[in-house]
Regions:
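Non-globular, low-confidence helical/coil segments that flank catalytic cores
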Residues: 1-187
Length: 187
């Protein structure tokens, strides 16, 4: 098994605990960096951000691994916890890749549980067809924010949220993307 991690130096105690657990469970731990690519099953992936040491990052959220996946006529962009500044930086450093993602239906894993720290410009550029928001029910942070949900609605993006729909899985069936939520098929 392979674990891909950010090269950002983070000295918080919980990071050490997670790193130790990862060392016990993963056969290989690699630092993901912009330009790194590979395959996973039928999909191809590419790291769009950060750089190897993530020196451009202000904090661990800003150093989130951003990956683009291409599979069976669909694309997936995962933003981790990347905030608005990082999303703008991503647009500058990976603009051609982001434009390419629009050539097929795009699924977006929304950054940071749908916090308000989002780039309208990035979302307008990529115009995701489906947005996945991983967020706890009745969380104290107010995630996802109304501004994010309004932005996605304005872009015509279908939204799936773990706080409403439970566990979410996607699969391709007869060249269509099918979502299963909470154990039941939808979309």
């Amino acid at each position: 098994e392979l674990a891909l991690v950010s090269g950002f130096t983070d000295n918080r105690p919980l990071v050490s605990v997670v790193s130790e657990a990862l060392a016990r469970s993963a056969k290989h731990k690699l630092i993901g960096y912009s330009g790194m690519s590979g395959s996973l099953g039928k999909s191809n992936w590419r790291v769009l951000s950060p750089t190897f040491e993530a020196k451009e990052a202000q904090d661990s959220n800003d150093a989130s691994l951003v990956l683009a996946f291409r599979f069976d006529g669909y694309n997936l962009l995962t933003l981790g916890d990347l905030g608005e500044d990082g999303q703008r930086r991503l647009m500058r450093s990976s603009f051609p890749w982001l434009v390419q993602l629009r050539k097929a239906p795009l699924v977006l894993k929304v950054a940071h549980h749908g916090s308000k720290d989002q780039s309208v410009e990035l979302h307008s550029l990529i115009q995701p067809d489906i947005a996945l928001i991983s967020v706890g029910a009745q969380n104290d942070y107010g995630h996802p924010t109304r501004s994010l949900l309004s932005m996605l609605q304005g872009l015509g993006t279908s939204t799936l949220r773990t706080d409403i729909h439970g566990a979410i899985s996607l699969r391709i069936e007869d060249d269509r993307l099918v979502a299963a939520t909470g154990g039941k098929l939808s979309m």
